[in-house]
A protein has these predicted regions:
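Short carbohydrate-recognition loop motifs
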Residues: 57-74
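Short, solvent-exposed beta-strand-to-loop segments that form ligand-recognition rims
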Residues: 178-197, 330-343
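An acidic-aromatic loop/edge-strand motif
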Residues: 219-223, 352, 356-405
Length: 405
């Protein structure tokens, strides 16, 4: 039987053409679009690959074929890599880091926005819940103190090398320490405003064996985990927010300050602000916190009650609050990080365990006003905001909450 060729080109030439076309098609297609990870990129620890954001030193040593990089604050940015999803691995030695905050920024959009993972080696690791921590970098501040759910124990060695592996997929991240089979830290919702960006190694530490594998997500779903508070109507989620001002340390606010602040709303408009996940009203995201004197903002909302009654309120906050209901003070609270004796449970992190108070309500509309400052009593500012939850909403109407049918 005679075979009729489909092309007049020689067989070898046709095969070469097919291979070339396939290669061009693959090169133009994102690896994620074909359900595969891109090749792993082992990064040389040489000056040509890293942009200094601080002092860097490069060296060689047996057992580290691509070299070592020692960072002496603030960090080193990996050149020519824009990372979205995939795996980042590295070895880190933090023996010279007294602050115990060396780690990695990824999805870095600028010097004020990124995701941050760091280790805190200590003698009580892996038992301590502070051995590994995640915090978003928002408005140039690390919000570690308002996301205690993203701090965990881990098999971290106090001295010498630790291996870190991050798997990032969409809004989720798993972190594995020292090649463990299961993640020490699972982040269900990455909290910065940047879905992709640069990679930066931070702190006072030595790094080696950096490998970046785009789109290698190991089956981790990109969708965020469910917000456990989403269906909880007891959270007071909708407020009006004043412009920010500054407040001197140790200043106490009273009724006269509240009346003056609310009177200014007639000439200086307040803006609406709504709670994020877990009922958190995130002031850092909207206002930021310049270093120096602590910032102060005022917020107000209206709760409508069918009758005169009193409700118990759980409050998580960072750092100092004054609350008024219908023109009368009902609660003041402090959640400083320094001195250690001033820390509320748990370890000055923001949770609903920080404070509780009784909220007296009259029949009809009730105006609740809050002042909150970001006085950490330390050299910088971190997370800033609050979450407020009523014990129940029987007989109440909250802003933004549809009445039960």
């Amino acid at each position: 039987m005679t075979t009729i060729p489909t092309s007049t080109a020689p067989t070898g030439a046709r095969a070469s053409l097919r291979r070339a076309l396939a290669a061009l098609t693959l090169a133009a297609t994102p690896w994620s679009a074909i359900g595969a990870a891109a090749p792993a990129q082992a990064i040389d620890m040489v000056a040509a690959r890293w942009e200094a954001n601080g002092a860097l030193a490069f060296s060689t040593q047996d057992g580290f074929p691509r070299g070592l990089m020692t960072v002496k604050g603030p960090g080193a940015i990996l050149k020519d890599v824009l990372f979205t999803n995939g795996t980042i691995e590295y070895d880190i030695n933090e023996d010279g880091d007294e602050d115990e905050t060396s780690g990695i920024w990824f999805h870095q959009r600028d010097r004020a926005t990124a995701e941050y993972v760091y280790l805190r080696p200590a003698p009580d690791c892996p038992g301590s819940v502070e051995c590994i921590q995640y915090g978003p970098v928002v408005q140039d501040h690390v919000q570690w103190d308002v996301y205690p759910e993203y701090q965990a124990s881990a098999p971290v060695r106090q001295h010498g090398w630790n291996h870190v592996k991050l798997v990032i997929s969409g809004k989720r991240m798993n972190v594995f320490i020292n090649r463990e089979a299961t993640p020490s830290l699972q982040v269900g919702h990455l909290e910065s405003d940047s879905p992709s960006g640069q990679i930066q190694l931070r702190g006072n530490a030595t790094y080696a064996n950096v490998v970046v594998t785009p789109d290698a997500v190991e089956g981790l779903a990109p969708a965020p985990s469910i917000d456990p508070t989403a269906a909880d109507a007891r959270y007071v989620r909708h407020w009006q927010l004043s412009p920010a001002s500054t407040i001197a340390i140790d200043t106490e606010l009273g009724l006269a300050d509240m009346l003056e602040a609310t009177a200014l709303a007639a000439t200086t408009p307040w803006e609406p602000i709504a709670a994020e996940r877990k009922g958190f009203v995130n002031l850092s995201r909207s206002h930021g916190t310049p270093r120096g004197a602590p910032d102060l903002v005022w917020l107000k909302t209206t709760i409508t009650s069918e009758r005169a009654q009193t409700k118990q309120v759980a409050l998580g906050f960072a750092r100092q609050v004054w609350i008024f209901a219908n023109g009368a003070p009902v609660y003041t609270g402090k959640n400083f990080y320094y001195p250690a004796a001033a820390r509320t449970t748990p370890l000055a992190r923001m949770t609903l365990d920080n404070g509780t108070f009784a909220l007296p309500l009259v029949a009809g509309k009730n105006e609740v006003v809050m002042a909150i400052s970001n006085d950490l009593r330390s050299r910088g500012h971190y997370g800033w905001g609050f979450a407020m939850r009523l014990a129940d909403i029987d007989g109440l109407a909250l802003p933004g909450v549809k009445p039960a049918m």
